[in-house]
Amino acid sequence: MKLSKHGVSFDEAATVFGDPLATTSADPDHSFDEERFLTFGVSRRGRLLAIAHVDRDDTIRIISARIATPAERTIYEEG
């Protein structure tokens, strides 16, 4: 994944999963063929990101990454 249209690279997005305060929840609105998840966490660059992903064969597959919205920031902060 190159730098996405949201200005977040795959490499930066992957660092969110190392955030001990990251929050992950199911994303039923986008789970059609497989269960999708949405994770909010701080990247190594210090940016709060929203990561859409699936867990496939014990591997996290990132679908998209973007800067978190103010509402998503609240979810993260309330943990």
Role assignments for model-derived ranges:
Residues 1-79:
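Ribonuclease/tRNase effector modules and their secretory precursors
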